[in-house]
């Protein structure tokens, strides 16, 4: 009874258990788990700048699980980092053929396309990702779409996407700051001021938000407030 319990536990921890001809149990490792281990190693090497080891581990991950989307995305990311853009594009396309409704692939391919200056196509894939019913990184895709729209010179579209980002994740500070900046540039001072004040209420005084408030009050002609925020920023800089 105890032996059976041990074998059952091994099966749950490591994968499927089969019995060899001599009657001994053989544990087969799960290919996804094996791929994940190699992905972790590969991305770690990539972050360290060891491209040779990164590629080796990411290619092994793909051999363990050729259709596993995280292995596909990881090797595509590697190709991007080393400038093999055709290989990256082909890897993304293959992944999309196999997983056409995977929001992570759609989002990452959109990011890749935006980096190549293919803004319209990138926007299409960001929105496809957002539309997937079981994709939960919607705020990240809206934010990516917003910054891509900025790169394309589509300020109004960017503002819309930043607003949608905040709707889905009110604590996404980068989008709040960027939207406030765009509102200041558009003369929408009240809207921008509210957003920046909310940041201070939630997180305390922050350098980026103070810098924007100084810019805002200068543009609005509020000299006393401009000086107030400048003094707060100066004090913060002295402490740091």
PLM region descriptions:
Residues 13-34, 240:
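Bacterial Sec signal peptide processing site at the extreme N-terminus
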Residues 34, 41, 68, 102, ...:
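Residue-level recognition of tetratricopeptide repeat
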Residues 30, 64, 98-99, 132-134, ...:
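Structural marker of alpha-solenoid helical repeat scaffolds
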Residues 40, 74, 108, 142-144, ...:
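Canonical tetratricopeptide repeat
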Residues 71, 105, 139-141, 175, ...:
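TPR alpha-solenoid repeat register
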């Amino acid at each position: 009874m105890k032996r059976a319990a041990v074998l059952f536990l091994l099966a749950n921890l490591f994968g499927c258990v089969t019995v060899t001809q001599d009657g001994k149990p053989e544990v087969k490792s799960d290919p996804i788990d094996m791929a994940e281990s190699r992905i972790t190693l590969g991305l770690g090497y990539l972050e360290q700048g060891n491209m040779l080891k990164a590629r080796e581990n990411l290619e092994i991950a793909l051999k363990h699980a050729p259709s596993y989307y995280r292995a596909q995305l990881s090797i595509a990311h590697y190709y991007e980092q080393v400038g093999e853009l055709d290989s990256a594009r082909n890897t993304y396309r293959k992944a999309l053929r196999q997983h056409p409704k995977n929001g992570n692939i759609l989002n990452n391919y959109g990011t890749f396309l935006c980096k190549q200056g293919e803004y319209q196509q990138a926007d299409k894939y960001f929105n496809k990702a957002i539309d997937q019913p079981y994709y939960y990184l919607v705020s990240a895709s809206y934010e990516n779409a917003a910054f891509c729209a900025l790169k394309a010179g589509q300020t109004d579209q960017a503002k819309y996407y930043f607003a949608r980002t905040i709707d889905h994740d009110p604590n996404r500070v980068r989008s709040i700051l960027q939207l406030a900046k765009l509102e200041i540039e558009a003369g929408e001072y009240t809207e921008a001021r509210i957003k920046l004040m909310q940041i201070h209420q939630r997180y305390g005084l922050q350098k980026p938000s103070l810098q924007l408030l100084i810019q805002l009050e200068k543009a609005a002609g509020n000299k006393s407030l401009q000086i107030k925020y400048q003094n707060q920023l100066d004090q913060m800089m002295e402490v740091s």
